Amino acid sequence: MSRRILALALIAVFAALLVGGCSDTKEETVEYTIRDYYSAYNAEDWDICLGHIDDTDNVGAATIESVLKMARAATGEVIVESVTNVNVTGSTATADVKITFGGQSETKEYPLVKKDGSWKISWQ
């Protein structure tokens, strides 16, 4: 009986560690989404890019991929300098993203939406 209690206690501790290890804030997961998107963009991995985009206007994956390829050819690699002013309200979020490409920097507000448990950049 004591081995069973010990085993259950160890399972409970292990489960608590797993849950405790997933302590990213909503703001951090928004930032990770944006940084992962640009990592895929720089690698020209369009499938991963498309996985980070919400196409609520139903533009279509082929059209978005075509636009991404043209943009990548024009910008070259993009460096994400910062992700700031992350504001999460329910299943929507915005973040100010400062990027540098071709020696130029710009900061834009990115709208995001949470779908199926993951943040997606809203395609506009």
Model-derived regions, located:
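Extracytoplasmic/periplasmic, Sec-exported soluble proteins
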Residues: T25-T29, Y38-Y41, V59, Q104, ...
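Short, well-ordered alpha-helical segments enriched in acidic and aromatic residues
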Residues: T33, Y41-N58
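N-terminal secretory signal peptides that target proteins for export/translocation
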Residues: M1-S2
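Surface-exposed, charged secondary-structure patches
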Residues: I64-E109, Q124
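Solvent-exposed strand-loop boundary residues in beta-sheet-rich modules
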Residues: T56, F101-G103, D116-S118
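A short, surface-exposed beta-strand/turn
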Residues: K108-W119
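Short, low-complexity N-terminal intrinsically disordered segments enriched in polar/charged residues
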Residues: I5-A12, A16-S39
